[in-house]
Amino acid sequence: IIFNWDWYAGDIMHMLNVREGGLAIHGGLLLGIGVGLILCYVWKVRPFNILDLCAPAIALAQSIGRWGNYFNSEAHGGPTDLPWGVWINGQTYHPTFLYESIWCFILFLILLYVDNHRKFEGQTILIYGILYSCERFCVEALRTDSLMLGPLKQAQVISLVIILVCVILYVILNKKRGANKI
């Protein structure tokens, strides 16, 4: 929506038409976290505790959800001769959905461990943000259907911003943990 504002500005309700696609994980995560933060404020609960609780489930849901890209024959990489390439319309392509699905499942396992051994509130969600965004930056380089933002793909730019924000928050919250032990 942000990158096609001129198209959406004339018909705001068109933004809600999910049947036409255009859904992206970064937008979904930002909306979900935004709504979650509002609910935390309303319910007077500590947001990083809730985000930490949700992080492993988000990674698992992404691992499963990426298979939708396979069934829709979308969000794949460029042509490949690798034996695990997926066959779409007479050509084999990098199965970027599979790369991301496998990584998100591994991330799910990592986050379960981190959450059970976390040192401060926010550690689990911040590690999710860093590791998922690193993976997404790399896999995005293989995809052929991405929006560009200068020399990088839009999702790569967003991933870099998320990594930067999460690393800064990680350092800040980790320094505060001495005063605020869990």
Q: What is each model feature region?
A:
Residues 1-182:
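A feature for loop-to-transmembrane-helix boundaries and adjacent hydrophobic helices
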